[in-house]
């Protein structure tokens, strides 16, 4: 299964200690270079930066081969969202992980299957990967 992730779902899953759901559900997760850069930004929470210090083998950073877009709607997105959509399109990804509403709408118009952080958690719960909360 080919899964491409934008910044926010990965950052949220790391922050709540549930990043390991990604390989359990999907195998490898691919992030474009812009997402990797966003994850390393100064404002990124320390827990995420620490996790990125020793990234797991299931997380793969790949560059998009897309040239500059001539689509104003795509250009309006931030670099991570833009590259995640472009990479998901190039790879014919089975799933794009994205929380941003505008990015999700654009991806859906491109007929890319999209889910967000809550969708990942819901799927994990359905297949029994989450323990019951108190």
Predicted regions and their residues:
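Active-site-proximal, substrate-binding regions of enzyme catalytic domains
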Residues: 1-95, 101, 105-112
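Acidic, PIN/NYN-like endoribonuclease modules and their adjacent C-terminal/linker elements
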Residues: 43-45, 104-134
